[in-house]
Swiss-Prot record:
Localization: Cell membrane
One GO cellular component, as annotated: plasma membrane
Transmembrane segments: 3-23
Pfam entry (one): UPF0370
Native source organism of the sequence: Yersinia enterocolitica serotype O:8 / biotype 1B (strain NCTC 13174 / 8081)
Superkingdom per UniProt: Bacteria
HAMAP family given in the database record: UPF0370 (MF_01566)
NCBIfam families, sorted: PRK13664.1
Extent of the signal sequence: none
Family listed: Belongs to the UPF0370 family.
Keywords, alphabetical: Cell membrane, Membrane, Transmembrane, Transmembrane helix
Region Disordered, annotated ranges: 36-64
Protein name: UPF0370 protein YE1145
Length: 64
């Protein structure tokens, strides 16, 4: 970890470069074009549908 104390500025320059490249790529993104050609999202599949009908709670109106 001694090298990190000596070269902390190199790590900082790399991080700043990564952030700037990310900002540049986000500026190139055309969100209006994406929203106009947005694909249809398939309906959500409920994986717990088979257990939804099972009622684990006791029935309050049921008499013993």
């Amino acid at each position: 970890m001694h090298w990190l104390a000596d070269y902390w500025w190199v790590v900082l320059i790399i991080l700043v470069g990564m952030i700037l490249n990310g900002i540049k790529e986000l500026r190139r993104l055309d969100h209006k074009k994406f929203l106009s050609n947005k694909p249809e999202i398939p309906p959500h599949r409920d994986n717990n549908a088979q257990w939804d009908d099972d009622d684990d709670w006791p029935d309050k109106d049921k008499k013993k």
